[in-house]
Every structure is written in C-alpha cells, then in structure tokens.
C-alpha cells in the first residue's frame, strides 16, 4: 500500500468511501510525517495531535456524508479556530484564542473533514516572512503569504490546506513549492472569520497536490456541481499565451519554459495564440497597490495605533503608504479595475483560458523575502479564477509553475483546462 500521507485527497476519499481506509490511519500518517520533518520545514503554527486523532476517530464512527469526510486539512493561521490558537503571524496576537471558527473551517467540520492544525502565515498575510522553509531546498523561501500551507502540502504532511490571496499569496508559494495553487473567482468561498486586509481583493484559496483535489474542496464548500475530469483527455481547449505587461520581469528560464510549452500544447490538441493585455492592464500592479494599501491602512487600524512597535518595519511602511492614498486616487483605481475586468471578459469570448507565468522564477535563496508577487497581482485585481500547476523545473532544480487563468465565475472549466495543461506538459 502507498504511504498514506502521500495519498491525494481524491484518492483518500475514494478509499474511505470504499471502506478501505480509516480517517484515523490517514491522520496518524500525516502526524507521523509532521513529526519527522517539522523541525526542518517549520510549516505549522499549531498542531494538537490528540485532538486531530479524536476528530478522525469520530469521523470513522459516523456515516460518510461528503467527499471531505475523514480528510485532514491544514488551515492558514489567519482564519479563526475555536480549538487552536489564532495568531495571524504577529506577536500582537501571541496565544490569542478566538471563540468560534471561521466559516470555511466550520464548513469543513460540518462536511466531515478533520482540522489537522494551523499553518504558518507571514505577518497578517502580508510580506514579512514567517519561519517556514521550502521543502525542496531548506535554504530557499517557500513564498508567501500562505507559506506554511504550501510547504506542508508539498512535504506530504497534509493532502490539502487553506490559503488566502490578496496579491499572489496562493499562486506564488504553490509555484515555489511545486504544488497546485487555486485562487477561485472572487467571493466563491465565504470569508467570515478571516482576518481582513482588503475587502476588494481578499480571496480564500487552496493548496493541494492535484487539480481534482482543488476542485473537491472548493466545490464542497461552495455547494457547486462536481467537476468530472473524465473528459479531460478529449479536450481541445482554446488557450491564449499571455505574457502580461510584466513579462520582462520574469527570468529567462521562466520565459523559455513557457515559450517552449506552446508547441507542446498545440501538439496535444490545443489551439494556442498570443494574447496581449495592453493599455490600462499595464497599470494593474499600481492599481492593486493603491486599493490594497488604502484598505489595509484601515483594516489594521487597531494594531497600527495600539501596537506600532510590534509591527514590522516592512509592514508599517506599507500601511503608512496606504494612509497617503487619497479617496480620489482610490476611486480612480477602482474604476480602472472595473474597466479592465470588462475588457478581459471580451478576451475570454475567444479563449477558454490564458496561460502565463506563476512567478518570476524559482524560489529565491534566503528566508528574508518571500519573492515578488507581480505575476499574481493583476489576476487578483481582475477577480478571475487562477490555478498554478507544477510543470517545469528551473536551473537549480526547483519547481516552476504555469498559471492558468479563466473567466470570472467559470471555475470548473478553468480547473479542467488546468488539469489538461498539467497532463499535456508532464506526460
């Protein structure tokens, strides 16, 4: 039998449904892996092994209700949890306990899932790094801000974990750690109980090892129809190769990997053409900064005014910058974002998905930075579903991802395209 901790969520769900796997055995295997590797990877902010095993034993005694039944999940430490500390990656909240679960956490429990523990986040899910290391090379960053979730999934500690994305905080760490990162369409997963940064851009996303696993958890949470991946082999998707206005910031190996992928996708049956996003699309990183920092300055007003000495210099600089954004500038940035969303919808009339870089390159060496989020910011502003799939290797042997972007609200077709691209470029 395969090592149980290496099962995908979909594989584990099938075994549980068939009566061939107990949740307790699966959770125990994940906890064993954490015990072996956590001192190196440092992906977890809090784990209560006995509580996790107790949840699993309870699930084994209950009738199976959903595909999530008995499946362990990691929860980024920006979501409230009633039974584990919630510290938001900040010393301000060290030892903090909340009285209830975030909506998505409560849903996982309701659907029969097992909360394995809380994963490390950067400070308030911004850019000041946490303690986590990249499991592919411990001297390299795992990215951020969902760094613990990405590293835990990549290192076989848990089959799936929640992340959040306000800039590129699901896509970038997933790409750096060689896993699947899925940022759903804006608003698809309920955000109640998430530590807010930006009402305009905060997304709840997932880190998994397969695209079907990403579909599984979000479909169960959102009540959406089940995506069937049986038809993937016969697909002939219309894919736009989108360099984006920030192409020059990608390193040469990333550019070459994506350019060389185009004929491979065409041979596999896709219709691929170049899509340019010009004009106001080139302003979207600037737009993102104006909107997100304006909102962040207000969202963290309590922490900023009461505990300024416990906020990193990096974050305080961003907050103060947000305080200088005027209401007029904020509204103008929102107007640009709305116009670009409308223009992008026109692009998708002729394309099922776009393919673009997930990050500038491999995970940078060192733990003082989480890398540059430039290749996630635009898609976050545009509110569209985005999936990064691990399909390349860089010159240092570290993972490189390809980012598949679809039309707003078309998450299932986007996931199907992402799975098709993954198969076309890895098989």
Spans of model-derived segments:
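Flexible, acidic loop-helix segments that line cofactor/substrate-binding pockets
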Residues: 42, 126, 235-245, 275-289, ...
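Short glycine/serine-rich loop/turn segments
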Residues: 69-203, 242-244, 357-370
């Amino acid at each position: 039998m395969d090592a149980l901790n290496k099962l995908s969520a979909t594989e584990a769900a099938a075994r549980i449904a068939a009566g061939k796997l107990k949740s307790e055995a699966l959770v125990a295997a994940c906890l064993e892996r954490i015990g072996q590797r956590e001192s190196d990877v440092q992906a977890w902010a809090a784990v209560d092994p006995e509580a996790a095993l107790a949840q699993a034993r309870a699930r084994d005694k209950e009738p199976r209700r959903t595909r999530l039944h008995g499946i362990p999940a990691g929860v980024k430490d920006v979501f409230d949890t009633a039974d584990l500390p919630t510290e938001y990656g900040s010393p301000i909240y060290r030892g903090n306990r909340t009285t209830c679960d975030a909506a998505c956490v409560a849903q996982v429990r309701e659907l029969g899932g097992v909360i394995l523990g809380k994963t490390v986040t950067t400070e308030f899910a911004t850019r000041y790094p946490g303690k986590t290391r990249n499991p592919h090379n411990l001297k390299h960053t795992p990215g951020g801000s969902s760094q613990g979730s990405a590293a835990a999934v990549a290192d076989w500690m848990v089959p799936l974990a929640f992340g959040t994305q306000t800039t590129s905080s699901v896509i970038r760490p997933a790409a750096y750690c060689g896993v699947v990162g899925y940022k759903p369409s804006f608003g698809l997963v309920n955000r109640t109980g998430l530590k807010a940064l930006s009402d305009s851009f905060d997304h709840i996303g997932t880190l998994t090892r397969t695209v079907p696993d990403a579909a599984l958890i979000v479909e169960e949470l959102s009540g959406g129809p089940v995506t069937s991946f049986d038809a993937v082999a016969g697909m002939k998707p219309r894919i736009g190769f989108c360099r984006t206005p920030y192409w020059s910031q990608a390193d040469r190996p990333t550019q070459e990997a994506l350019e060389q992928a185009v004929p491979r996708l065409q041979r596999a049956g896709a219709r691929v053409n170049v899509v340019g996003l010009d004009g106001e699309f080139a302003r979207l990183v600037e737009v993102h900064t104006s909107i997100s920092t304006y909102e962040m300055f207000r969202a963290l007003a309590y922490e900023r005014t009461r505990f300024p000495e416990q906020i990193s210099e990096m974050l305080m600089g961003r907050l103060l910058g947000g305080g200088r954004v005027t209401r007029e500038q904020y509204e103008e940035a929102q107007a640009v974002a709305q116009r670009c969303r409308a223009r992008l919808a026109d692009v998708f009339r002729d394309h099922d998905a776009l393919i673009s870089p997930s990050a500038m390159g491999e995970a940078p060496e060192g733990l003082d930075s989480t890398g540059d989020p430039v290749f996630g910011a635009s898609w976050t502003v545009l509110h569209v579903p985005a999936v990064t799939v691990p399909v390349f290797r860089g010159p240092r042997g570290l993972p490189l991802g390809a980012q598949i972007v679809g039309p707003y609200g078309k998450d299932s077709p986007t996931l199907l395209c992402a799975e098709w691209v993954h198969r076309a470029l890895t098989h």
